[in-house]
């Protein structure tokens, strides 16, 4: 069972697609670096919808898998 997505992952899912559409040959490592820098530049107020969605996903995950324990 995968862990629920955090706010960055929720945001980056759509942003990654946009970058891949513009630069299909860009390596995944470079895309990830760009996404990380862009996320850090966002204001806290811009992150709120993604934080809320991540919270919703976390609650759903807890309901779906009540005995879940993260084991790396």
Curated annotation (Swiss-Prot):
What domain of life? Eukaryota
An example of a Gene Ontology BP annotation on this entry?
brain development
Q: Where in the cell is it found?
A: Nucleus
Picking any one GO molecular function of the record gives: DNA-binding transcription activator activity, RNA polymerase II-specific
Q: Name one GO cellular component term.
A: nucleus
**Descriptive protein name:** SRY-related protein MG43
Q: State the taxonomy lineage.
A: Eukaryota, Metazoa, Chordata, Craniata, Vertebrata
Primary localisation category: nucleus
InterPro entries (alphabetical): HMG_box_dom (IPR009071), HMG_box_dom_sf (IPR036910), SRY-related_HMG-box_TF-like (IPR050140)
Q: Which stretches are labeled DNA-binding? A: 1-69
